[in-house]
A protein has these predicted regions:
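Long, low-complexity, charge-biased intrinsically disordered regions
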Residues: 1-196
Length: 196
């Protein structure tokens, strides 16, 4: 049994419908509660149930909304979210459209933390330049949006197995000689999908 709480919303997950009903009964006896049935979307994340007991978390509708909002619906897709040959440095010229850049970064951070961990590195790298950006930062940011355009349907798929927590990590302690920034990353998987 898993209970997920967010402010005044509760998701109840379990393998037995009887146990879920019992938990709902206990909660409704102690709190004012409204049962909305099976959840389809929560916090802009679609829950897609598979016939084999798996579930996929997707934000394709949110990606579409972000691309439309920032005028990237008609752009050509990019194969990867980040080009490692591009060296991002502090801007030495006039800052270009800082507010819009930070709005896009915020939208991408939400995607990266919810269902699109594959863009985390690029978004993290680009967020370092929110207060000091130039044209090369914009081109790199546009690449992330173009990558999402080509992969809107991507999400995180969870299966019943394996029931083992797997963890992976890596680090590059001095990857940027100009700024002396260290870069590290990690991923923990459960049921075949990323949980952290």
């Amino acid at each position: 049994m898993i209970l997920c709480l967010y402010v005044d919303d509760i998701l109840i997950f379990g393998t037995s419908l009887n146990v879920i009903k019992e938990v709902k009964g206990l909660l409704s006896n102690n709190f004012e509660m409204k049962d909305l049935g099976e959840a389809d979307v929560i916090l802009n994340v679609k829950l897609i149930r598979e016939g084999n007991g798996g579930v996929t978390l997707s934000q394709s509708h949110y990606v579409e909304k972000v691309l439309s909002c920032f005028g990237f619906s008609d752009h050509q897709p990019a194969p990867t979210p980040y080009d490692p040959s591009v060296l991002l440095r502090k801007n030495q010229r006039i800052v270009r459209d800082q507010l819009r850049y930070s709005q896009i970064i915020s939208s991408l951070m939400y995607l990266a933390s919810a269902t699109r961990p594959g863009i985390s590195f690029a978004v993290s790298k680009l967020s370092r330049f929110v207060s000091n950006l130039g044209d090369h930062h914009w081109r790199a940011l546009e690449r992330v949006l173009r990558y999402l355009k080509g992969n809107m349907s991507y999400g995180i798929h969870y299966t019943r197995y394996p029931r083992v927590l797997e963890g992976y990590c890596d680090a590059n302690w001095i990857s940027d000689a100009d700024e002396l920034y260290a870069t590290s990353g990690y991923a923990f998987l459960l049921g075949g999908g990323v949980v952290s």
